Amino acid sequence: MKLTPTKLKLLIEEVINEAAKGAQDLPEDVYVKVFEYRNRIYVMFTDEAGEQIDPVDLDTGEDNPVWGEVSFVEEDRKNPCDKSAVIAVTEVSDGWGPFLYDIAIEIATKRSNGLTPDRFIVSPQARKVWDYYDTKRDDVESFQLDNEEDSFRNGKQDDCGQESSRRDTIINGGEWSDSPLSRRYTKESTILDSLGDKLIWEL
């Protein structure tokens, strides 16, 4: 079978779909902790006591299947970004990135005006997730942000750094505004509501 660009895109979407996890997939001893530290909001996998889960079990030396965190700042330091929060750091085990992103978007929707990707560098894996939000997720809304130069000439309120979007066009083509990294995203709190006693909320 010849692997055309269209077929490759479909395969990538299938992998993302299959790998993505939900609250029902959390191991019995894994929880989700949400807290603020040094002006960042953290969404982190922890144990029942709220202690961070490391990639490797220090007692056994074996890999932990579920670990990681997503953090974001509630406002960009340089640009308004339409009052959206901005991703800061993402480190997460395979298959669990979209789950933590979903929660981060839900929190940012409640507290800010949604969430936008890192404004400078986004990994290829994270870029696929944002593209999936932008094109395939009916439960996630995307809103176009302007660039630092107010290219849309609609005022500065939605101006946002677009370095990651411009970098994206080098690989994927198009204009910076075609990139899924150029937008902010909002989502209803369905994942947060589904966590029940698995959620350790400290905001």
Q: Where do the language-model regions lie?
A:
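Alpha-helix boundary/N-cap detector
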Residues: 3-7, 99, 186, 190
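Terminal substrate-recognition subdomain of acyl/acetyltransferases
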Residues: 19-38, 44, 65-79, 109-203
